[in-house]
């Protein structure tokens, strides 16, 4: 910090010295008895003198008319004390001796101040020529590598048409995923194809000649090795700088005071989360050594611990519909055309016009559609009273109901808060069960008071008949009399 202040003080002192030198030079060039104006007015006078010297007296008269109210151009009048200085500069401008000291000073000042800000430009090191037949091997299994190289060899021999047809044919085959442009192995595969193509289709003799020259004169390799070594050291230094910057960023991230943050919500893991059926964790080494088919199976096939339940079929197996047989209705078949099993007995068949118009389909081809069962014929589900809320719960759902009620109340509150944030309505259904229970107790004509089950239609009709008979006072014995 102190060095920076000393540098700024040094620049300020140098600028003041240069400014004083420029003033001294200008004052020495001005004849005796001429008043030297201040720097701001002096710059205007110098510019005006240069323009008037180029454009003539008409331009001076135009400035005098346009700037009558401007005091900065008062030097154009003969009674102004700075008018002699203007005449002196006008004479120098006409003779070509006028110099812009202010412009030179500002330019020099700007360059002086901008000099320490400039960063040193690093020397660019040209990249060496790449190796022709050397390619870093990606993480791939030996089986996939053999398939890739064999495919690249055939593609180099037969051309791009073979590659296009093969990629279309094996598009769904995971063993040939390296043919897809979005696969990570596709660039490596294309470089291998280029290497095989350069060897098979375009044989060149320059590599052999170069190798022979290297054997004859080993010291000639130094001129090729040195640029590559410089490039390698340069790349290592760049990687080191990037690593240091990453370490600095991690250090700054670690210095964050995490206690300043506010906890919005806490997620708690229960025992059910610990015993949940999740996929087995994969290892990096297993992923690198696995083949393309195994990788595809890892992400697509379900785990063996899972059991997949299938619903029973709702229809019989489908069979193709056979064409209806041609029959002659109302005509007796001759004995020669009769089947041998029937012994030549003729048979006549008569069909109604309606049946003749519509072909008869096999019953096996029509799926069985399950019709909805009326509530009156549905089996009655036994109900149980919940010990927590007192509401009626089906006996088959009582276990799940108890599990939900025994959950941590804090988790339930957090879940309610989350659902209230996601919901677009502010309606609550807290007393729905109580309202339904009160409705059941009041509507005895629709629900049974004892178990809360809906009364069947037969029971309703029976009650209506009983109420009608009691209203008229009619009994079976009275009707007989």
UniProtKB/Swiss-Prot annotation:
Q: Tell me the superkingdom of the source.
A: Eukaryota
**Native organism:** Schizosaccharomyces pombe (strain 972 / ATCC 24843) (Fission yeast)
One of this protein's Pfam families, by short name? Answer: Surp
Q: What does this protein do?
A: Involved in pre-mRNA splicing. May be involved in endoplasmic reticulum-associated protein degradation (ERAD) and required for growth at low and high temperatures.
Supply the name of the protein.
Pre-mRNA-splicing factor sap114
Q: Which GO terms describe its molecular function?
A: RNA binding
Q: Where in the cell is it found?
A: Nucleus
The UniProt entry annotates SURP motif repeats at 44-86, 147-189
Question: Spans of biased composition, class Polar residues?
Answer: 1-15, 345-368, 467-481
State the GO CC annotations.
Answer: catalytic step 2 spliceosome; nucleus; U2 snRNP; U2-type prespliceosome
Note whether Transport occurs among the keywords: no
Please name the SMART domains in this protein's record.
SWAP
Quaternary state and interactors: Belongs to the 40S cdc5-associated complex (or cwf complex), a spliceosome sub-complex reminiscent of a late-stage spliceosome composed of the U2, U5 and U6 snRNAs and at least brr2, cdc5, cwf2/prp3, cwf3/syf1, cwf4/syf3, cwf5/ecm2, spp42/cwf6, cwf7/spf27, cwf8, cwf9, cwf10, cwf11, cwf12, prp45/cwf13, cwf14, cwf15, cwf16, cwf17, cwf18, cwf19, cwf20, cwf21, cwf22, cwf23, cwf24, cwf25, cwf26, cyp7/cwf27, cwf28, cwf29/ist3, lea1, msl1, prp5/cwf1, prp10, prp12/sap130, prp17, prp22, sap61, sap62, sap114, sap145, slu7, smb1, smd1, smd3, smf1, smg1 and syf2.
Q: Where the protein is mainly located, per its record?
A: nucleus
| Alphabetic keyword roster | Chaperone, mRNA processing, mRNA splicing, Nucleus, Repeat, Spliceosome
* Primary gene name: sap114
- The region called Disordered is annotated at 1-34, 335-373, 452-481
**One biological-process term from Gene Ontology?**
mRNA cis splicing, via spliceosome
